[in-house]
Amino acid sequence: MQSSEGSPDMMDQKYNSVRLSPAASSRILYHVPCKVCRDHSSGKHYGIYACDGCAGFFKRSIRRSRQYVCKSQKQGLCVVDKTHRNQCRACRLRKCFEVGMNKDAVQHERGPRNSTLRRHMAMYKDAMMGAAEMPQIPPEILMNTAALTGFPGLPMPMPGVQRSHHHAALSAAFQPPPSAAVLDLSVPRVPHHPVHQGHHGFFSPTAAYMNALATRALPPTPPLMAAEHIKETAAEHLFKNVNWIKSVRAFTELPMPDQLLLLEESWKEFFILAMAQYLMPMNFAQLLFVYESENANREIVTIVAREVHAFQDVLNQLCHLNIDSTEYECLRAISLFRKSPPAASSTEDLANSSILTGSGSPNSSASAESRGLLESSKVAAMHNDARNALHNYISRTHPNQPLRFQTLLGVVTLMHKVSSFTIEELFFRKTIGDITIVRLISDMYSQRKI
């Protein structure tokens, strides 16, 4: 297998463009050389300026307690530079120590400092798990997302203008409302069509939260993201979704049991909508490869790989419909104020069986039916308000698409068929362990700390 150190750039066949690996990203300090091999550094690693290649080599060597032997006739005198750094591991490690790399920094490393899920998991664990090394992904997986047998390719990329609109939508959709009665949620360059609130005001997030979130807009998504970055961004969106829900005044006025129940039932749809709006396209082949390498249960791996098809189908439809930010907001409201709990998918039934989880934990949808909503009529009214807002907006902005409203509602129904178990396994299982996403976001919502 060819090392990725010598070829940071890879050609993505699907998009016919160069995809930069993490080593070729904007983190590279072209004016500061690596003290080990003199390649471009990417910042300080273990006490010195070093490139990702040497930093990764040092980390692996220390964590695995490697004892290398120099095979050269001139013991310990091998050249360690960008060209020859992989030829003698013993001399490379020796030079790492000579230039000042600190092995204690590796031993006490606590994983990515900006890990969203790890920050929130601190509520449940006194010590956070160390960041395990990402398995080396074969080039054929990186370059061809259809490499898995029978696995479909990625969704077609959005046109350039539409993609820029999607990235701009994050900040545009979260601007403070211009007035108490009208909120403009249109994307850039779309004619101004203000969305009027229903009498319940579900489009009324608090101004303080909107101002704070507007200053934390995510950077544009690259054409293809590495699996680790996808998971991190997915976690960020998961908790941003919860914060968005907390900012909806009509929702927070419901009894707390109703809020928690609706949150538990809608987190999956919110996650799918966020992934479609802000994180397309995705390399599912990378995600599955990493998941398979980390999971010894072949039965679960097989089920997750099969269920990813449904997830991708929904993302494909959402992508191809060119949904703007206002429509996304309406779809979120429709998903949030659901009149009845969605039916569990077959995979979720399996996930709740002792075969997969070792426990017979009840399905959240089943418990929803037994508990019911305390303010069911109010929730139903807000659901109707959201549907009417979407219908009225589409009538004004897409008069030549009479079926668009029903098509979008159909996608909402299709989202119900995506397995929340698969999403949890693929994006979050390694980090959250045995704790369910439902419990995690519900506890955080209740404590009002995210």
From Swiss-Prot:
Keyword Cell cycle in record: no
Predominant location: nucleus
First and last residues of each zinc finger (NR C4-type): 34-54, 70-96
Pfam families (alphabetical): Hormone_recep, zf-C4
MF terms in GO: DNA-binding transcription factor activity, RNA polymerase II-specific; sequence-specific DNA binding; transcription corepressor binding; zinc ion binding
Compartmental location: Nucleus
Keywords recorded for this protein, A-Z: Activator, Developmental protein, DNA-binding, Metal-binding, Nucleus, Receptor, Repressor, Transcription, Transcription regulation, Zinc, Zinc-finger
CDD domains linked to this entry: NR_DBD_TLX
Highest taxon, organism lineage: Eukaryota
Cellular compartments per GO CC: nucleus
All copies of domain NR LBD, residue ranges: 187-448
SUPFAM superfamilies given in the database record: Glucocorticoid receptor-like (DNA-binding domain) (SSF57716), Nuclear receptor ligand-binding domain (SSF48508)
Family: Belongs to the nuclear hormone receptor family. NR2 subfamily.
Summary of subunit composition and partner proteins: Monomer.
Protein name: Protein tailless
Name of the encoding gene: tll
